[in-house]
Amino acid sequence: MLTVALTAASVMPMTVYAQPAFASGGEVKVVEGDVNGEMQGGVMSPGAMAIEGSDLKVNGNVSGGLVSDGSTVTVNGNVTGNGIDTVIAKKGTVTVNGTVTATDLSEKTGVLASNGSNLTVGDTEVGGKESTGVIAESGSKATAGNVKVSGEYMTGTSAYGDSTVHVKGNVTADGNGMTGVSVHDGDKSSLIVDGDVTATGENSVGIYGETGIIKIGGDVSGREAVITKGKADVTVGGSVSGTLVGIVAGGNAAVSVKGDAGTKTGAGMFAQENATVTVDGNVTGGTFYGELEDFEDVYPAIIAGTGATVIVKGTVSTAEGNGVAVGINCKDIGSQKGTLIIEKAKAGGEASAIYVDTIPGVSQEYILNSLPDIVVGELAAKNENFIWNSYDNDLYQNNPEDETIGELNEKIYAAIRYMIRWNNSEGGSFSVDGTSKYGEYDVAQENQELGITIQIAEGYELESISGGKAQVLQRPDGTWSVIVPRGGGVNLSAVLRRIIKEEMKNSRVSNPGASGSEEQTTVQKSSGYVEFQKAVRSQIKNAAPGAVLEVDGKNWMSFDRSTMEELSKRNDLTVVVRFRYLGKRWRVVVPDGYAVQTLLNQEGYSGFLYLSAVFGAVPEEA
């Protein structure tokens, strides 16, 4: 006979259960059905509670919250609470395979992991005031689905004391004085949100970071979208959008935004003290808060202190009106020399691209020495008034008295480093003499002459060379040169034409819309040709950024105007076209960044043979 000895730690299954579920003394208990909290001795006990190393499982819903103190609690259902800390793990492990709903909280927490706990819940919704949806503290880890809080002065989720919070969905905070996510203490604290962080209402903040690491996979929005200080390290995988300000970074904080950053009113970015802010996309400023609609001045897109590091890989621009792209605040002095690296700074209206707000009572030499290193690709402003400053003898009583605003402008111009850019290709490569390196950038300064040599590959010939905003001059020895203009914009490019076989050079198809097996004298807009163009346009629209797009021309011999217009919107794409001609398969490559609409003929077509003449065609096996 088989005998089984039962101990106090054995599994104790229960049936339909409405009263609180409780486990203690190391017991293992399984409760089938819903459980509710109840008043015991004038105190509301939670719906589920495990202490003293116990293991409690509830296969149902829990009303009245749950507590794990040094124990394990699993709920295969939903958890609700009213006016209480609804899910609490203290030195324990909690798993809720359902939702958590907490209502009418006041200075409470919907989900709390503390003292080294490990807590996992599903979607969490919390309402009330001065409360938080999900908190991890004192070395704990909390994982949740979507987190939504509503009410007044609520926070979606927070991490304290070297703890980790991971939200696998979105964080939404809706109400007055709301904060989406925050990290307050613990250099090793981390807060990760896979989706978006959205804070709406008056005085709302999307991200507030004082230390630790914050990583957001999607977009961040709020009245003030991102506020950081201390040693906070923030990464946003999407874009940042504020209604009052996009980013405020101070202390030694670091903020990295993979998309754009901007605001409706105020500055798109404040970079203060020793902060570092990197934006891979564009930065835009807004209007002045509360001004009349016809007020012509707008806020600078960026305001940076002299010790901050700002890197923008896109364009910095303002709202419509008179607005400075970048304002440098010389009164905001960090403990280090700052850096300002911007692809393009574009002023609004009558303003300058860069404005330097100087310090009263100091010399121009002092101001110049305090400025950050300025590295730009291009400055854009009306009438080429790219730089302006507030240096005014009468107002600031600067010394010496004979120094003027205009003189300081010229000294700032002389200190700017301009990015010098060029693209090499299969047909040839540039060699540029006279540049220097600033980090990853090749740079030169105003009025500096640069020597240019092009190494042309065998089978190619040079058709033309351009310097962007710089004029290219040919030297007697066959090389070229450019002089860096004020405002930069030096972008070297060359059109290299492949010398193709005689059979291609001498061949001609009079109908760009005809198939490769038949020449016609009139354009046949057949349904097959129309469908081919439609399919190519769809490829272009859906291509990943920077992709190499493979187009099978089948038996067609051209692109129409609509297709080329669509391609002109995607100058990041390289297009490889394969087509059949004279019994052979050919391949022609249209490089990224090319002005493709110039390849259209008068009838609005771009024939593959013409593309071959411009870019060169390579035969392939039939």
Feature locations, PLM:
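Surface-exposed interfaces of beta-sheet-rich extracellular modules
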Residues: 372-391, 395, 448-480
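Sec-dependent signal peptide cleavage junction
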Residues: 10-25
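Extracellular modular ligand-binding repeats in secreted and cell-surface proteins
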Residues: 367, 372-374, 431-461, 486-488
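Bacterial Sec-dependent N-terminal signal peptides
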Residues: 1-5
